[in-house]
């Protein structure tokens, strides 16, 4: 068994009890129906399954595709049953998805699996009363990487061509938790046990020193696919992250460059580290999850801006709301304002000659 597999499996096993006890009303939790192990791709039925969570009785459901983490080599939807219930209790139809793990399934095959999962959900929309105009994605760690690459698959034909499959639906919003958004940076970082190099080897079948020769290197950098069409996104991250340090900051810079509407929460303590919101308790976890609830509620209500448009003060100390104006918008707004009206009146009076 590989070191990287041991590490990421241990994280799930050790944290399982805590991560799967979200703060839920007991009656709501009992009302949630779970349909497990639905196969969405018969060609890889050993791994391509999802669990569906919902509370019966709604006419239409917002839809969430949740993608677990695990360093690309480990993880399972069963370890994300808590967060799936947490979202389902909000009236959302949640699809908690498994996908092919490396090295059995080399990248980008797992990404193609996830596009197929999206398409299965699209095909089930009528039967399950899903509102695909309120379809969003979320994931933690490697799951956040895949979530951001699904957005790239929605927005770029060349990504679809690489995968051999195109999404049938558009992603309307995203919640990204402590993700990886630039593998090129990660392979050059120094990490304990060389965990990044080991994961890259499982992910691609190559050594990290050979990254430039990797056939699919263009699909390893989600930040490269940020553009004006990127959906509103909540980015949650830890400034002391031992696995994905500096990754969210790079994504946010890309958002700023393209005027993407985003909100973010950053923990600043070492204790609130990688994927801290899944721990539920503690100042940072509670604040991040409160912001997530607010963000998702506004998304469902249709109250999130499609693009960044203006600067507002932060709602609380942990949340950074980015709504920047473009230079063009600034010029337009200035053009509409009267410039020094009193001075203009004085100049007009001086040039006015008395009639004879």
Located regions from the model:
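Alpha/beta-hydrolase superfamily serine-hydrolase fold, recognizing
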Residues: 1-347
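Non-Sec secretion/translocation targeting segments of pathogen effectors
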Residues: 353-356
């Amino acid at each position: 068994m590989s070191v990287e597999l041991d590490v990421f499996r241990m994280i799930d096993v050790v944290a399982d009890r805590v991560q799967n006890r979200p703060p839920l009303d007991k009656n709501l939790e009992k009302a949630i129906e779970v349909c497990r192990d639905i196969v969405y791709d018969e060609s890889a039925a050993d791994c391509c399954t999802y669990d569906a969570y919902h509370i019966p009785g709604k006419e239409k459901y917002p839809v969430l595709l949740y993608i677990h983490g695990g360093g690309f080599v480990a993880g399972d939807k069963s370890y994300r049953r808590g967060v799936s219930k947490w979202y389902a209790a909000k009236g959302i139809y949640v699809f908690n998805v498994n996908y092919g793990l490396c090295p059995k399934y080399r990248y980008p095959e797992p990404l193609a699996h996830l596009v197929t999962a999206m398409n299965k959900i699209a095909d089930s929309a009528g039967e399950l009363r899903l509102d695909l105009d309120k379809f969003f994605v979320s994931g933690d760690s490697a799951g956040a990487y895949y979530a951001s690459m699904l957005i790239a698959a929605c927005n770029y034909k060349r990504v679809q061509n690489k995968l051999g499959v195109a999404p049938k639906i558009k992603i309307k919003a995203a919640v990204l938790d402590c993700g990886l958004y630039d593998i090129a940076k990660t392979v050059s970082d120094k990490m304990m046990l060389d965990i990044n190099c080991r994961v890259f080897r499982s992910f691609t079948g190559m050594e990290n020193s050979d990254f430039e020769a990797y056939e699919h290197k263009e699909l390893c950098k989600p930040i490269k696919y940020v553009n004006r069409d990127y959906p509103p996104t909540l980015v949650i991250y830890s400034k002391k992250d031992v696995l994905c340090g500096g990754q969210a900051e790079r994504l946010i810079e890309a958002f700023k460059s393209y005027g993407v509407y985003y909100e973010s929460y950053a923990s600043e303590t070492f204790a609130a580290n990688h994927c801290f919101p899944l721990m539920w308790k503690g100042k940072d976890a509670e604040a991040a999850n409160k912001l997530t609830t607010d963000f998702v509620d506004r998304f469902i209500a249709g109250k999130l801006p499609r693009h960044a448009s203006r600067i507002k003060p932060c709602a609380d100390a942990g949340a950074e709301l980015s709504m920047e104006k473009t230079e063009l918008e600034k010029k337009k707004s200035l053009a509409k304002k009267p410039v020094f009206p009193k001075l203009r009146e004085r100049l007009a009076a001086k040039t006015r000659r008395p009639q004879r």
